[in-house]
Structure formats: C-alpha cells, structure tokens
Amino acid sequence: MKKKMNKGICLLLAATMLTVGATGCGSGGSDMEEDKNLVSEDTDVAENARNSTDETSQDTENTDKEKDTEPQSSVSEAPDIEGLTFESEMSLTYAECFHVYYYNDGYKLLDVPESGSYLIVPEGKEAPEGLDENVKILQQPLKKIYLAATSAMALFDAIDEIGSIRFSGTQVNGWYIDSAVQAMENGDIIYAGKYSEPDYELLVDEGCDLAIESTMILHTPKVQEMIEMLDIPVFIDRSSYETHPLGRTEWIKAYGAMLNKEAEAETFFEDQAQIIEELKDFENTGKTVAIFYMNTNGVAVVRKPSDYMAKMVEIAGAKYAFSDVIDDSTGTTMDMTMEEFYSAAVDADYLIYNASIDNSVTSMDALLAKSDLFTDFKAIKEGNVWTTGKSLYQATDIVGQLIRDVNLMITDGDESEMTFLTRLQ
C-alpha cells in the first residue's frame, strides 16, 4: 500500500479499524491514566522484579551499590540476513533491551526483543529480497517521524535531530524540552494526535515515514495495526524497561543508528556515563527513601526494587524503602493498599511523591487529605516529603541530576541546587 493513498480510503480504513473490536491490552501494563498527555510512558513497562535483600553492614551496602552501578556489556548473536554480510555489533554498556547489528553497505538491524526487528536501509538502497516478513523496514532518510514516545525527545535533541521529527503525540503545553516547544511554536513539529488517537489523514498527507511509540501502544493494538496498514512502520521504544538509569539514556544509540548519528550519540552517552561514575562514590547514609503516588482508587503506586528509579536512590547513597518487597506482577510499579504502604514506608526517612504522574499534591495538607494514616509517617512528621517536577520523565538525557537531587536531599544539601525535587510545605 502506498503512503499517498486517497484521503477517503484512509478515513474509511481508520473508521473500520477502530470499530472492529474493543481496545486491547498488551504486555506493557500501566498505572497511568491514558488521557494524561503530560505524563511520559515511563510507568508503562513490563519487566521481572528483582528481589533485594538487606545488607548486613554499611560496608556491604557500599560494596553492593558499587557492583550494581558497574557497566554490564551487552553482547548477542547477530541474525543472518540473506544477501547481507554481518560486520559488527554496536557496543552497549548498560542497555539490555535493544541491539544494533551492522552489515555490509551501510545496512543495520535494530533488534528490540518483544517489540520487533527493524532493518535500517540506507538512502538509495532497497531491502534485500527474501527478508523475513516479521522484520520491519526503516528506509533512510527518516525526516518525518511521528513521536508518541515522549521520553525519546530529549535524546533526539541531544544529537541535534529534533528536525527529523515532524509530528508530535504531545501538545506544545505538554513539553518541557525547550527545543521541542520552539519547534512546535514555529510549526516545524505539528501535533498529530496522541498515541491512541493519531490523525491518520495528517500522517498520510504529510508523508510520515516512521511512528515511534511507547509500550502504551500495546493497549490499542488496532491503532498500531492501522498505522502499519498505511505503510508507516511502528517502532516501539522499550527504554523504560531498562533497570539501570544509564540503560535508559543509552537508547540514544538506537536513535543514533536510525539517523546515522552514532558518533554523536556515543559522545553524549559517554559524557553522561562519566557523571554517573562520579556519583557512584556517594557514601551510603543508611537513610531510607520511598517513591510513590496515590491513584484515584486510593491505592499507593510505588516503584519496584528492580526499577531504575530505585537504582537511582541506591546510587545517591540511600536505601530504597521497598527493597524487600516481592511482587511478581508485570510492570515497574506495583500497587499497595494504604495498609500495606503504611507497613513498608511509615518509618521511611524520606518520601518522594511522583507529581509527574499525579500533580494534585501541592502541599502537605493535600497529601494528608489522601489518607488519615499519613499523619503517623516519620517523613511527614519531620518535614521530609518531596515532590518531583512534571518534567522528570522527559529528562532522559540528564538522569544524573535526579541522583544528585536525592543525595542533596538525604544529606541536607543546598535545595537551590536541585533540578527535579521540591520540598513539600
């Protein structure tokens, strides 16, 4: 099917596809409300929880923390592609959720387990005959991308490729990245509907060449199918599945491969890795930190011990309050009744309320209104409750700043130097 199809056919297909069946649910579960465009897809991930155990001494805690921050080189086996010769694999240090394989004549295979394989075809060349039908083709140059995965925008910006994005799944007032805001205000990037309700006609008329989605798209499989029927490949970003904060940042290399900006991506990543390397020497304070928000059902939603935000807390020199909690469900967050949350976090030294998910808590009174049980919490009694900024999940490129913030928080550092955290009054 050609992209420049008749508008009537496009609209008819869209109407047909979206009325065939009810919205589906994929493997990427989410605790986030679908209509909150200001929130990144970061809470919509599915990964196995890693169970943690108490360290017996401060020395042991520091040793384990250092081990957890050590880079783990990712190596895999390159797929055979008929007509192409494998040459090398991209070196990855922390990322575990994608691989890039290089073949002759500039061909690349971007493999994202559980999402798909994508053959990047150089400009002026064609995909080899006999290519596995499950391999999606990304034809360079990619200059009219529909970006529905908000966490990727900062990575595009870091390699100076916001110009490759033509369509946004977030409205201008939902962006906290200056370059994205400016591009939308200038008309260089246009709003094309959120991930679950894209403007198909606009994407076709403007010649969209790639849709980059978060795993939220798995909740609306008919939408993904419709986009692909319009001959627009769908790439699903799984950076939120990474268990190390730098694994998430290292996804800049995946986008660098798409846009032939590997060198720029490597340079940027190494700079960020150096920042984390310097931060990992923070002394373990023994302080405990809980990260959570309350959903509309009065349930506490917390980050699992395997989540990269829990890892940030450890690198910053604290212990994650839920490190001993075992949860076998999918997702990097887990639901806890208020009673369960009370049991696990009542004695936590610090509470961090995730305002990028729920921004209703703007004062201590607003938090106390969520449950009477909060009055017993140590952190609330001592005034050690903090909130994150709304921009947190879009800041994929500066993960070290949150680690610094947490360290400043637990060491009574200068609050004016914080980027994301604000003390709740």
Where are these regions (language model features)?
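A short, structured surface patch at a secondary-structure boundary
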Residues: 108-204, 210-217
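C-terminal motif of bacterial Sec signal peptides marking the signal peptidase cleavage site
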Residues: 20-24
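Soluble non-cytosolic domains of exported or imported proteins
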Residues: 139, 193-198, 214-221, 242-249, ...
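Structured C-terminal subdomain patch of bacterial secreted/periplasmic proteins
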Residues: 73-75, 242-271, 347-425
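Extracytoplasmic ligand-binding site segments that recognize negatively charged/polar headgroups
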Residues: 143, 150-161, 168-179, 219-222, ...
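Flexible, glycine-rich surface segments
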Residues: 275, 281-362
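Bacterial N-terminal signal peptides that target proteins for export
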Residues: 2-12
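Bacterial Sec-exported substrate-binding components of ABC uptake systems
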Residues: 25-153, 264-291, 414-425
